Amino acid sequence: MFTKWKEKFAAKKATDHAVDESRKWKKNALFQDCLHAMRGSCTVAPMDLHEAAIAAVNIAIREGTWAELSGVSEDLFSGMVYLVWGEATLPVLRAPWAVAVENLKRIRIVDPNAFIVAETMDKILWFSVHDRISLYNIT
């Protein structure tokens, strides 16, 4: 009986923490700018995908392997992508590839250090301060 109560308490605590984090993001002006840049066509990624996207970006940065994006087919990035912001405390957002591409300039204005991670988690687009788009290949 004590174990069930303990599990129930732990689940409630985790839920309360998620709600608190959500409230904190809603008050964050930069996060509101991020949402505005995506014109509301995105959702906050689940925690497991959030962690996978952050890990993919960290690997790409550490390995430093990249190639220019020229000639890359849009088909390569069809589906959903994850926006990883330069501000580590902001949640990863999930959005359709077409919406992310359509709003590139707005994303750069909000956070020039933002990354976009493809659904497959093996390709990362990086939007740099100098308006250059690079393709990271971490496979």
What are these model-predicted stretches?
Residues 1-132, 136-139:
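Structured alpha/beta or helical-core interaction and ligand-binding surfaces enriched in interleaved
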